[in-house]
């Protein structure tokens, strides 16, 4: 019995990114159903996106693990489903103010990043250096860039790292996003041999995982007022400007491709990715990843908005004009 319990605890720690991924899904669903006033039951169903990722990973693992790990995976999946059902049918609403929700989000985002840091460090100090070095810097540029370009604002938080306009919580959130997404992708690569040989395929999986996470997260954040979108952005999905989801995909794909290309080319484990030489490579390629992200983003929005005169470019033009520049 002791041996089995020790094995289960090791599985819990090993699968902390997956458990964290599901915990975030439950937390978002809880806020949507119980804490928003009035409740946004129309958004509750979005838990299917992170749950689908979990189900796909459990299915991919099925042939590669023993009976205990299969039971563990099934328990995680069914347990999460039971909690979600219980919250919808049995839990009583407990409305919270915007300030209370914001405070809870801010604390949980920073605590989550700290937990991620401990998990990464226990796996490898070099892996922690990768996520709290270049990954953190890349995320900070993304978050602050969106604000500086005029697409959204993030006000009312208690902790800012001046002179950056983005709060510490949302910048730290990118560390969590990339760590969870990359950890899930590495698990998929272990189970699917052809994926382990394809950096592009793996980057697409990472992007899909990130979008499944954001399809649930951003509708809540928008409804709760965690960030405020520019009023010109009228093309929406799940109550969120379509631009947001395109931005996530455009940000995650090139950066994850850069990391996964290094791993595939060198045939190394994730724990070795943060070695000194690879860290230098990643730091040097951040500008290239940002450029690729910008090209993907603006090209995609031009397609969705039918040209370069849509809301995305109107916001950009207004912002540049405020900075004393112009597109034409």
Task: Name each model feature, range by range.
Residues 2-328:
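Aromatic-rich, lipid-facing transmembrane alpha helices and their immediate juxtamembrane interface loops
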